[in-house]
Structure formats: structure tokens, C-alpha cells
Amino acid sequence: MATLQGQPVLILREGTQRTVGRDAQRMNIMAARVIAEAVRSTLGPKGMDKMLVDSLGDVVITNDGVTILKEIDVEHPAAKMIIEVAKTQDNEVGDGTTTAVVLAGELLKRAEELLDQEIHPAIIANGYRYAAEKALEILNEIAIPISKDDDEILKKIATTAMTGKGAEVAIDKLAEIAVNAVKMIAEESNGQVEVNTDYIKIEKRQGGSIEETELVDGIVLDKEVVHPGMPKRVENAKILLLDSALEVKETEIDAKIRITDPEKLQKFIEQEEAMLKEMVDKIVNAGANVVFCQKGIDDLAQYYLAKAGVLAVRRVKKSDMEKLAKATGAKVLTDLRDISSEDLGEAALVEERKVGDEKMVFVTGCKNPKAVTILVRGGTEHVVEEIARGIEDAVRAVACAVEDGKVVVGAGAPEIEVSLKLREWAPSLGGREQLAVEAFATALEIIPRTLAENAGLDPIDVLVELKAAHEKGQKYAGVDVDTGKVVDMKERGVFEPLRVKTQAIGSATEVAVMILRIDDIIAAKGLEKEKGGGGEGGMPEMPEF
């Protein structure tokens, strides 16, 4: 509400709430910090798990940052912005989501301290941008170059990504599976290695133990053979991929046929049979003995295919069809009229197997497959889900390392090194921005501090030891959460992809700067609740932060 010559002037709709200046900044910073604090206890190998129960009573148990943040329902817009940071981190690199969120929360906490000292938000924002730019430069300097053939380092990266996800009993095997999967689908072009992790299918099946998780050099489908008379096992498979139905097409116009003679009805049925027989003959004549169809297969077509000894699967998802094409070298056909043997893919074996209580179709032994499957097993549904999330993180982390050819050590070492270098560099800026750079350097310490806290160690003692080691030039010194000692993480073999750190720092800085620059919140009146929600008039309640 504004005033003109002492008279109130109503500009905003009645019920609209407006918060301005420092109150708006404090409210946004508080909301962001609450979200960061919610996931902070999950960080690191000793991080705790969260049990999430949705409105239907479904339970998710995880310590994966992005999974937690996707499941919780928040109303505050600043909190939603922090959750977007986790989603971006997950989409770009697949790991480091908790790191990004915790760092964003700490950057805002340190910014609030500067605001209390009457430092303008624009100056803090500029200082943070300078610091982030310098931090990425320092990270590149301390990064360790690797090649896609450094299997041991790649396995260590996968192990680091999976640690704390309940996979410890078989972590070496799972790490090897993740590395082999990435190496199988990696492709080189113009001297650059490219890895599209979409072509690594993670199929989950409850039953057995984690040790039974396996890498399949082909595709596993959660489907079964359509007809009992079809073979359940085909060796030296010639595979046809079809994205149209194996059925007689109906006309688009709403036509009716009046049959007056029973013989004509018989001829009509025979004509349909002949058309289906012709379709199957084309498939068989092209040399196909396995058919994967994206749509339906007519009962009669199933019979003819079974009679010809062809294994067929229907209603295959489009994404699986694309993976089958990549794995077997087949082309996805829309029309059988143009079918030839060149369109078929190859696999050493296609068979239906019983996994747990259900049947699945395995396409294995593909020559140089560019799509593979990791079949995850585990005793309970929650275990399988969490192991699958861990493997997905590991696969994405290894893919980043292979593509970039650079890694950094973990355990809080890079954050302390960058923090130290930023403090040395800050005085060269002059002006109040150096205070923001120093605040940025302090904020980075939240990562090793949290790792220590979550392991039950004294964070102050750990930070003092870490800083002392880095002051002496030990740039790979990090905290060993098992012993509480500061050790060389390069020798210990704790590695993370460089991209995980650069993306986390970049995303956290961007969202912190964006939130800092907001000085006015105008919230429209919410939809009215049922009477009793906010007194007699049913006024909407204020959202909780």
C-alpha cells in the first residue's frame, strides 16, 4: 500500500503479501539454509540415511541428496531454487548433489554475516562471482590428468561415488561393473571420448543378493515371449526391430461391410490370414529368428511366428528399442515392405530366463555393443533401489572422468586447498569485494567440516590439522573418516571427477547470487481453503518455511 498526500492508495490486490528489503533477504536465506541443513547429515561415506514417506504411504530410504529433495514437498520459492541446484547437478554430472546444496546454504549464511556488516548485496554478489571464477581456475591447476585406460583410478572414482550407499559388501565388484559398462559404450570422435550414459540400462530385480548384480553385454527386457509355442532360447540370433504393429491395419474411415453370404465371410477371414501370413513370411525370408515389436502382435501372427520357430516380444518401450538398435546393430523398421537381411541385428544369444519371480528376456553376446545393461539384485526392494542409485552415481562419475580426462582427490582436500589459495588471492582485489571472497573461502570449509561431523569427529580439530597440512604444501591432504587422521588422499585412492566439483561450485554460486539480489517478495493471495482453515472467513494460512 502506498500513500499520496496522506491518503492510502491500494495498488496490489487485497490479500497480497509483500516483504521488502532486509526482511525479504533474511526470509529467502533462511528458507535456503533450512533445505541445505536437511540434507547436510547425508554427506560423505558416514552420512546418515533419510526415510521419506509420501501421502500414499510409500517409503523411500536413501542418502542421495537429489532423491531426498525431489521427494520432499516445499512451498517457499527460495527453497525451490535450492532444490533446482540439486537437479541441475544431477542432470549434468550425476553426483555431488548434496555438496552443491550444502555449499549454497553456507554461501548464503556467510553472505548474511556480511549483510549484517552493512555490505551491499551487489558487492557480495560480485565478490562471490570473482571467487567462483578463481576457484575453478585453482581446481584445474590441482587436477590430476588420467586416460580412459586408467582402470584402477576409474574404479576408485566409482568406489568413492558408491560409498555410503549400502553397497560396501560388494563395492569392488560393483565398481568394476560401472567402469566396464562405461568403457564398453564409450565412443571416440575427433580425439574426444564421448559417453552417453543413457545407453547404460539399469534394470532392477528384487531377490538374491547384491553380489549377484551383473553386467550384461546387451539388453535385458522386463518382458516375456508372447506365445508359449515359441522357442525360449535362440542362438546366433538375427534380430528384427519393428515399431509398427504386426496386425492387419484398420482403415481410418469408419467403414462397415455387409456380408450376405457365409462364404464371403470365410473369404474375408482367409484374406486377413493371408495378409498376416505374408507379413510373417517376409520376416522369415529376410532371415530373422527374433522379433522385438514396439506395438502389438496379432494372435494369428504369433501362431505363424511360433510355427516358423521365431522368438517374438511385443510392447517393447521406445527407449529399449533404441538401446537394442545400439547393442545389436539393427535398424528400427516402420514398414515390412522394405525389409532385408541388412536391417537385422545380431546377438550370440536371445533367451527368456526366470529372474526372481518374473520372466525376463536377455539379449546377450552382442558384438561391440554400444548399449549395455546392469542387472541389479538385492534382498529387499529398498536395498535394490538404493544400490541402483549408487551404481547410477558411479556410472555418471566414471563417464565424467573419462570424458574430461581430469580428476581431483576427495575427502575435503580440494575445498581446503581452494579456500587457502582464495585467502591468499583476496587482498589483491582491493575494495569490499575481498571480504566476499574471504567469506566464500570460509564457506568452502563446510564440506570437510561436515564430513568430520558426520563421522563423529571433532570438526575444529580436523579443520586445524587440514589447514596446517595444506599450509605445508600437502595439497592432497584430506580427512580419513575411518581413523580421523589427515592423510594423502592421492595415495589413499579417493578420487572424484573434476566436473563434479566445478559444477557444484558454479551452481551453488549462481543460486546464492540470485537469492542475494532479491529485495522484494510479492506473494499473491492463495486459493481459499475450506472454512475453518484461517478463521471465519477461511483466510489462507501463511506457508510454513
Curated annotation (Swiss-Prot):
Any one GO molecular function term: unfolded protein binding
Pfam families, sorted: Cpn60_TCP1
SUPFAM superfamilies (UniProt xref): GroEL apical domain-like, GroEL equatorial domain-like, GroEL-intermediate domain like
Tagged with keyword tRNA processing: no
InterPro entries in alphabetical order: Chaperone_TCP-1 (IPR017998), Chaperonin_TCP-1_CS (IPR002194), Cpn60/GroEL/TCP-1 (IPR002423), GroEL-like_apical_dom_sf (IPR027409), GROEL-like_equatorial_sf (IPR027413), TCP-1-like_intermed_sf (IPR027410), TCP-1_chaperonin (IPR053374), thermosome_alpha (IPR054827)
UniProt keyword list: ATP-binding, Chaperone, Nucleotide-binding
NCBIfam families: thermosome_alpha, thermosome_arch, thermosome_beta
Quaternary structure annotation from Swiss-Prot or TrEMBL: Forms a Heterooligomeric complex of two stacked eight-membered rings.
Family affiliation: Belongs to the TCP-1 chaperonin family.
Function, as annotated: Molecular chaperone; binds unfolded polypeptides in vitro, and has a weak ATPase activity.
Annotated protein name in UniProt: Thermosome subunit beta
